[in-house]
């Protein structure tokens, strides 16, 4: 079963007038992981798609998606898949890939139908691609590791870069995930924006009762979302994206836009936030 929800782009002047329900309706990515289903959110920010596939032992195939108006979803798109569950498989073209928990699979444009199987919980990201590039399976051990933060500032963390120029080639998609060390709660501090790219977060590995306070909005007009396990946030190019957790968590970040330069960001110091 395939379900697709469309999210329109929101400008910052309108966003700052929204109440809690309105903010969650536009920017919270939830209800993406249902057993036996593929559920996608099609955003108008760089035509980025995020979603989940939970085969639960019965294969699920993603092929034609009406919103793209192409014969197959990946005809003019690339895809990044992260397995946040148990071991599963992804088949595309004539190849089948085994993904353990934490593995990332990149599929280039023209990969045709994609089939998910096994016990995996697959997080899907996708954006338009101008050329076809080879598929690549990247394990945590093969990712580029970057240490940031400090215990004193409660933001000591490891950034693992997977779909990234230092690891592999993609067209527009950049993806990785960040793991916080014990005792640290803050991610992406100092905050930043990048007007050249949108970004999406997925928070996972959280206790049922735990929440992440996700900060968003223009630096002078910040807002917040309380986010549960396996929920995410859609971050427009004009918005900061930071958060603090009540308990441990990991988050997947994915970006699409004008470039794939991870360092292309404009930092906002805490004293400049309102």
From Swiss-Prot:
GO terms for molecular function: 4-deoxy-L-threo-5-hexosulose-uronate ketol-isomerase activity; zinc ion binding. HAMAP family: KduI. Binds 1 zinc ion per subunit. This is 4-deoxy-L-threo-5-hexosulose-uronate ketol-isomerase. NCBIfam families: PRK00924.1. Disulfide bonds: none annotated. Catalyzes the isomerization of 5-dehydro-4-deoxy-D-glucuronate to 3-deoxy-D-glycero-2,5-hexodiulosonate. The lineage of its organism: Bacteria, Pseudomonadati, Pseudomonadota, Alphaproteobacteria, Hyphomicrobiales.
